[in-house]
Regions:
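Expand to "…catalyze enediolate/carbanion chemistry for C-C bond making/breaking, isomerization
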Residues: 1-195
């Protein structure tokens, strides 16, 4: 699966506060991402040497890198059964801030498409929350309106503390649709609107 440290470094260097790393399933992927997010700008041999050193070998560099990356957010997008099976291992890595569940993809990968009230789906969510709580990480949910607010509240009760509520395109489209509706209501249904 795609896990590109160079892309992660690029978006953070361009000003992103952090990243949601898509479709994470392995410890190797997490380690690559943590190195890129938490040890920028080091790469290659310099990164390998730095990662293997004790804290006292280069205190100025350690301090600089810690200050430079302390506010960088790294969330692992958990969307598959292998990720659920390894969730404790994945979130135990120092440098991971938390996970973001993609409910649609996870439900499909569990073989129960959009069955958000299915016992298998709920059990997977409980496993994720338990692991994040054990390791002091954030449990976030990508909520695109699936199942309504009642379902969102049920997920909150499970222990999810952070939400991605829709997306910017959704809000823009909804705003435009509302404006068109008002315009047609005031000007008559026969008005043509060009966007």
């Amino acid at each position: 699966q795609h896990c590109d440290a160079a892309e992660l470094r690029f978006v953070i260097d361009q000003g992103a506060a952090g990243v949601v790393a898509p479709y994470i399933e392995t410890l190797e992927q997490v380690n690559v991402l943590c190195d890129a997010a938490r040890r920028r700008p080091l790469q290659g041999e310099a990164l390998r040497r730095f990662a293997g050193e004790s804290g006292g070998d280069r205190p100025e560099l350690r301090s600089y890198i810690h200050q430079r990356t302390a506010d960088t957010l790294l969330l692992l997008n958990i969307e598959s059964e292998p990720a659920i099976d390894r969730i404790d291992e994945l979130v135990s890595v120092e440098g991971v801030d938390g996970v973001l569940i993609g409910p649609h993809d996870l439900s499909c990968n569990l073989g129960i498409p959009e069955a958000y009230d299915h016992d298998r789906f709920s059990e997977a969510l409980r496993e994720v929350v338990a692991a994040t709580q054990r390791h002091g990480r954030v449990a976030a949910m990508h909520f695109m309106g699936c199942g309504g607010l009642e379902l969102a509240m049920a997920w909150r009760e499970l222990g999810f503390t952070t939400w991605v509520q829709h997306a910017d395109v959704y809000f823009a489209a909804r705003g435009v649709a509302d404006e068109i509706g008002r315009l047609r209501g005031e000007a008559g249904a026969s008005v043509n609107v060009v966007i």
